[in-house]
Amino acid sequence: RFKKIRRLGALPGLTSKRPRSGSDLKNQLRSGKRSQYRIRLEEKQKLRFHYGLTERQLLKYVHIAGKAKGSTGQILLQLLEMRLDNILFRLGMASTIPGARQLVNHRHILVNGRIVDIPSYRCKPRDIITTKNKQRSKALIQNFIASSPQQEELPNHLTIDPFQYKGLVNQIIDSKWIGLKIN
């Protein structure tokens, strides 16, 4: 995990740790000129590791984004940001996207009153995301919400009620709220 961060820069979805500033200078001195292939590969790897996708999943999302009207890159980022695991991460119900995936896989999360155990579930506007009405589920979410830093601003397409352990998807995400810098 830390090798990936050193190589690709900060990946907030993978871990809250940041690369040291000195290691970045060493990499720039050692690397020389970066080819177009290398730049594209690094950007693709950033997407994969930040969102926790396999190569095949990313290719499917690129294919869907290519068929849709509009900028393929923007639509791809919208598709990735509207995944259930990513929305839990953005709401602050999980510290990382892998942590959010585990919450979903262990059936702690309800979407519109139904258990969803698929982390790649594509959320739609007006979806209500809650925790299961069990003490253990609520305790897990409460720990994440309490330990998450409150200075992070919530994206305008999401709202959260931390006392009821409930989040709401208001609309499709705006491109300025995407936290990952992709070239």
Curated annotation (Swiss-Prot):
TM stretches of this protein: none
Gene Ontology molecular functions: rRNA binding; structural constituent of ribosome
Coiled coil: none
PROSITE patterns: RIBOSOMAL_S4, S4
Domain of life: Eukaryota
UniProt cross-references to SMART domains, sorted A to Z: Ribosomal_S4, S4
Subcellular location: Plastid, Chloroplast
Ranges where the S4 RNA-binding domain occurs: 82-143
UniProt-listed InterPro entries: Ribosomal_uS4 (IPR022801), Ribosomal_uS4_bac-type (IPR005709), Ribosomal_uS4_CS (IPR018079), Ribosomal_uS4_N (IPR001912), S4_RNA-bd (IPR002942), S4_RNA-bd_sf (IPR036986)
Cellular component aspect of the GO annotation: chloroplast; small ribosomal subunit
Any one biological process term the GO annotation gives: translation
Keywords from the named record: Chloroplast, Plastid, Ribonucleoprotein, Ribosomal protein, RNA-binding, rRNA-binding
Main subcellular location of this protein, as a coarse class: plastid
Protein function: One of the primary rRNA binding proteins, it binds directly to 16S rRNA where it nucleates assembly of the body of the 30S subunit.
Family: Belongs to the universal ribosomal protein uS4 family.
HAMAP family recorded: Ribosomal_uS4_B (MF_01306_B)
Subunit relationships: Part of the 30S ribosomal subunit. Contacts protein S5. The interaction surface between S4 and S5 is involved in control of translational fidelity.
Protein name, UniProt field: Small ribosomal subunit protein uS4c
Organism expressing this protein natively: Schizorhiza neglecta (Lapeirousia neglecta)
